[in-house]
């Protein structure tokens, strides 16, 4: 079974540009590209991204784009929504939106933002007519789904559903908001172990729906969390590989073309980072602090515990990397039961039943020490010393030495976890924002660790 295509923003951008190019060359005589057009798109896409998607996967993404375009055109061509192409905004009232979304819930994604690359999409879908039915604007839904249908839809995987909302449409701005909320809840202490608690998920769900109007469900957020975690895992393994020569100062790799070729051959999903780093790395470092670290291979605590109990002398199995975060739309091509490379029950750790990291630390340390790559990981791991933190703090001109914020930071440096977060935030402005956030919430002064 071939892997499911996961379309993160950079892949989507490359695909759209290639489609526009072939359209301008006359290789799209109708609603789809000719054989020559698809062949050119496929070859160029693989060369530019390193992702070995096949022709059918590209066609699936084209069909998804086409469906999204019809949703958009139907919305702007509905007279009472009052679309203004000059300002790129709708002048519809809240009641107008409520009525329209009742009949067309998939259009909710466009209430706060227009489609990305709108001008390019207009080129691609020029001449595609969208019928706007008169009864579509009545504000009354003629066919309501039963509660059972809605419940089933909520329980489906984002990847296997044809409904963009059930599938989970994660634009770059929505994904960024999701990460902001994850950071916020992490700093509030609502991620006691590897997953967020009920209070954390409740806050994230309410805030993201209030800001986007998309109506995400909790399973959708957890699914996106899992995929985001997997993307971070791929990145951490990549920067931790000595052959790739990652330089955190220049934020670039020093590996040769041959070294890249060898690494991607063994870790094909790392090809997405061949020409760019993982988006929002500073935020991800905070979110997954203590769970997945650069240079380390992540082993879930539940699995570590089972392995240790079954065979104390057994080295951990270093598993293959897993799919990239769905930061855009993931096409249908189900894998296992629910698609999206769903984790097995053994892999998935329920937040209410997960073993706290503190309790599992000793067992994880033992297992890592048994690994043949442990020495390399340990030698490359930063020390995160108090002296290192103070040196970095003194280098921030905006923070006056002896000020309230400065002294607050010194107190935070007593705890290793905060030293790690502070040093992983590479931008001075981000370090200041993090310190000010903690200070404004009357964060308790940690004890020495």
From Swiss-Prot:
Domain Myb-like: 162-225
Regions of compositional bias (Polar residues) in chain numbering: 314-324
Region feature Disordered, mapped onto this chain: 297-324
This protein's GO CC annotations: nucleus
Keywords: Nucleus, Transcription, Transcription regulation
Pfam families xrefs: Myb_DNA-bind_3
Annotated compartments: Nucleus
Tissues where the protein occurs: Expressed in seedlings, leaves, roots, stems and flowers.
InterPro entries: LIMYB, Myb/SANT-like_dom
Predominant subcellular localization, coarse grouping: nucleus
Summary of the knockout phenotype: Increased begomovirus infection symptoms. Up-regulation of the ribosomal protein genes.
UniProt keyword annotation of Transcription regulation present: yes
Role this protein plays: Transcriptional repressor that associates with ribosomal protein promoters.
Subunit: Interacts with RPL10A.
Protein name per its UniProtKB record: L10-interacting MYB domain-containing protein
Organism of provenance: Arabidopsis thaliana (Mouse-ear cress)
């Amino acid at each position: 079974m071939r892997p499911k295509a996961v379309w993160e923003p950079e892949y989507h951008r490359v695909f759209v540009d290639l489609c526009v190019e072939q359209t301008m060359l006359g290789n799209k005589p109708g609603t789809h590209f000719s054989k020559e057009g698809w062949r050119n798109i496929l070859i160029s896409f693989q060369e530019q991204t390193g992702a070995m998607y096949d022709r059918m996967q590209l066609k699936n993404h084209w069909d998804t784009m086409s469906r999204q375009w019809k949703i958009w055109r139907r919305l702007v061509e509905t007279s009472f929504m009052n679309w203004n192409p000059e300002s790129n905004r709708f002048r519809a009232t809240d009641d107008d939106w409520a009525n329209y979304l009742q009949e067309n819930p998939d259009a909710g994604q466009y209430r706060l933002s227009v489609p990305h690359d709108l001008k390019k999409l207009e080129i691609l879908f020029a001449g595609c007519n969208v019928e706007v039915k008169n009864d579509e604007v009545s504000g009354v839904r003629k066919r309501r789904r039963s509660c059972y249908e809605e419940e089933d839809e909520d329980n489906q995987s984002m990847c296997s559903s044809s409904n963009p909302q059930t599938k989970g449409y994660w634009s770059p701005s929505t994904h960024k908001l999701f990460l902001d909320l994850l950071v916020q809840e992490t700093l509030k202490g609502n991620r006691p172990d590897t997953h967020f608690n009920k209070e954390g998920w409740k806050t994230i769900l309410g805030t993201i729906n209030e800001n986007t109007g998309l109506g995400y469900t909790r399973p959708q957020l957890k699914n996106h969390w899992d995929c985001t975690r997997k993307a971070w895992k791929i990145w951490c393994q990549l920067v931790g590989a000595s052959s790739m020569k990652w330089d955190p100062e220049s934020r670039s790799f020093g590996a040769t073309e041959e070294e890249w070729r060898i690494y991607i051959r063994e870790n094909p999903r790392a090809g997405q980072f061949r020409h760019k780093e993982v988006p929002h790395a500073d935020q991800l470092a905070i979110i997954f602090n203590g769970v997945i670290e650069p240079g380390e291979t992540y082993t879930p605590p539940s699995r570590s515990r089972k392995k240790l109990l079954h065979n104390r002398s057994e080295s951990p199995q270093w598993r293959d990397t897993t799919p990239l975060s769905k930061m855009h739309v993931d096409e249908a091509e189900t894998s296992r039961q629910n698609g999206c490379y769903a984790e097995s029950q053994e892999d998935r750790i329920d937040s209410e039943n997960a073993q706290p990291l503190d309790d599992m630390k000793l067992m994880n340390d033992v297992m890592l020490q048994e690994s043949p790559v442990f020495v390399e990981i340990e030698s490359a791991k930063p020390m995160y010393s108090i002296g290192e933190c103070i040196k970095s703090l003194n280098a921030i001109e905006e923070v006056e030495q002896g000020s309230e914020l400065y002294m607050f930071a010194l107190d935070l440096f007593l705890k290793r976890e905060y030293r790690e977060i502070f040093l992983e935030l590479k931008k001075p402005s981000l370090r200041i924002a993090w310190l000010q956030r903690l200070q404004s919430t009357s964060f308790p002064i940690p004890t020495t660790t």
